[in-house]
From Swiss-Prot:
<dbReference type="GO" id="GO:0140007">
    <property type="term" value="C:KICSTOR complex"/>
</dbReference>
<dbReference type="GO" id="GO:0032006">
    <property type="term" value="P:regulation of TOR signaling"/>
</dbReference>
<dbReference type="GO" id="GO:0005765">
    <property type="term" value="C:lysosomal membrane"/>
</dbReference>
<dbReference type="InterPro" id="IPR011047">
    <property type="entry name" value="Quinoprotein_ADH-like_sf"/>
</dbReference>
<comment type="function">
    <text>As part of the KICSTOR complex functions in the amino acid-sensing branch of the TORC1 signaling pathway. Recruits, in an amino acid-independent manner, the GATOR1 complex to the lysosomal membranes and allows its interaction with GATOR2 and the RAG GTPases. Functions upstream of the RAG GTPases and is required to negatively regulate mTORC1 signaling in absence of amino acids. In absence of the KICSTOR complex mTORC1 is constitutively localized to the lysosome and activated. The KICSTOR complex is also probably involved in the regulation of mTORC1 by glucose.</text>
</comment>
<keyword id="KW-0677">Repeat</keyword>
<dbReference type="GO" id="GO:1904262">
    <property type="term" value="P:negative regulation of TORC1 signaling"/>
</dbReference>
<feature type="repeat" description="FG-GAP 2; atypical">
    <location>
        <begin position="126"/>
        <end position="155"/>
    </location>
</feature>
<protein>
    <recommendedName>
        <fullName>KICSTOR complex protein ITFG2</fullName>
    </recommendedName>
</protein>
<dbReference type="GO" id="GO:0042149">
    <property type="term" value="P:cellular response to glucose starvation"/>
</dbReference>
<feature type="repeat" description="FG-GAP 1; atypical">
    <location>
        <begin position="19"/>
        <end position="48"/>
    </location>
</feature>
<keyword id="KW-0597">Phosphoprotein</keyword>
<feature type="modified residue" description="Phosphoserine">
    <location>
        <position position="104"/>
    </location>
</feature>
<dbReference type="GO" id="GO:0034198">
    <property type="term" value="P:cellular response to amino acid starvation"/>
</dbReference>
<dbReference type="InterPro" id="IPR031793">
    <property type="entry name" value="KICSTOR_ITFG2"/>
</dbReference>
<comment type="subunit">
    <text>Part of the KICSTOR complex composed of KPTN, ITFG2, KICS2 and SZT2. SZT2 probably serves as a link between the other three proteins in the KICSTOR complex and may mediate the direct interaction with the GATOR complex via GATOR1. The KICSTOR complex interacts directly with the GATOR1 complex and most probably indirectly with the GATOR2 complex in an amino acid-independent manner.</text>
</comment>
<feature type="region of interest" description="Disordered">
    <location>
        <begin position="248"/>
        <end position="271"/>
    </location>
</feature>
Amino acid sequence: MRSVSYVQRVALEFSGSLFPHAICLGDVDNDTLNELVVGDTSGKLSVYKNDDSRPWLTCSCQGMLTCVGVGDVCNKGKNLVVAVSAEGWFHLCDLTPAKSLDGSGHHETLGGEEQRPVFKQHIPANTKVMLISDIDGDGRCELVVGYTDRVVRAFRWEDLGEGAEHPMGQLVLLKKWMLEGQVDSLSVTPGPLGVPELMVSQPGCAYAILLCTWNKDPGATPTSEGPMEGHSGAPGCPGRCVAPDLWPHPQQERLHSPHRQHQASHSPDSSASGLFALCTLDGTLKLMEEADRLLWSVQVDHQLFALEKLDVTGNGHEEVVACAWDGQTYIIDHNRTVVRFQVDENIRAFCAGLYACKDSRNSPCLVYVTFNQKIYVYWEVQLERMESTNLLKVLEAQPSSGSCWESWAWILMSCPPPAPCFTKPSTIQTSLHSAPPRAPRTPPSWTGFLAEQGAFCTSPPPPPPQLSGIWKTGSAHYWGRMAAPLGCGDCRPPGRLGEGRDKLPLCPFPCVPHLSRQQALPLPRAPYSCCL
């Protein structure tokens, strides 16, 4: 297990207290760039944008906000912010700016009156977790709410009017499930036939899969909340629970796999339902395929309280991201390769996803809420690879496209040059020679050579800008503390290579004036333009 360090961090001001699920990332203003939404126990909803430490705008809600989300809950093609309080108040906030930003980049109403929800409705109280997603495969989003009293309810938005600027309608109860254990998290995963399945994690070493088949039953129609309140479920829509002795108590998240989705959608007979990850408070992490196939299990020595998914390598496969109370964060890929990252503060809430912090583009980020009234956003959380490697293996994997910049950088670190770039391995001299070494008589294909051992480089790069200077003796240049005469056919044809020291190739950098023997030339800040 290797450790990484991310240094690109933004500290956001946050003075309230929040529940673990009252934080999320999403595009609240429909500009394709994600923002950070945080709800506190006083009912204040704060939206952070870019790298500004202050909230971009705020919205005042009623009650203690226990969970927030961003999505097209009204199925209008427009994202809204959803905030649900412990008292059962459901809020819709339309935070798309109607006015331009001021000179400092803040919304014009930030310094004046706070934003207000455009819609509010009372639903059953004691909310804990929330999910906005298509759970029945009809192409429309539903709102799924998990409660502290072991109940899960599914709602759908029903329009009561058209043409209004803000939504006009109400939430209609679709289904109520009564479970045997507490609800810890909600997630959606594709089923065997590509139909979404609603997954609920529970204590007692179990999770439940709740089937939503009201669209397939002609006699089943959405009803109002009142008549459905006392029902445990309509016929044809049972809750399917896994036996309690199969899986540990999970906090779960859907783990996206393009290959698995492709197989499920094009192979109707396949029983594969994709991948999902599980974690427990005692530090157990598992990756599951289908309901009974364990791909791998990892045990760590920290108490894990949050589990997310994030593509940190850019290969299209999302990695599992688990966070512990003490700030230890684990990133694990499909092959059980583990990378860890430490935040030096205790954490009370965590989320991961895409956030537009810099350069007006979304990038992978990790968000930590501490007990010291701070929110830390680590942006550009990316890794070239998950597995450990060394520099020689990198060149061996890319013999044709390997950069000579990397080759010379390795040379400066006193590493042997890799075989793909050099025709002959060489022992690098780290001391500065006062005179150029004797070149080989008949090099196979000469545009540059290294000192002492006759290793040849087919396309030496311009001097790295971090070196202190170039030493020149005759027509040979020396970089830093390395004895490496250079020649580059890209700038001007090299001279004839003879037996004597005066027959070295012509200077590869015509923009550099001729210097006398052992005269130091300060290196410019930028590489030579003639060799780019």
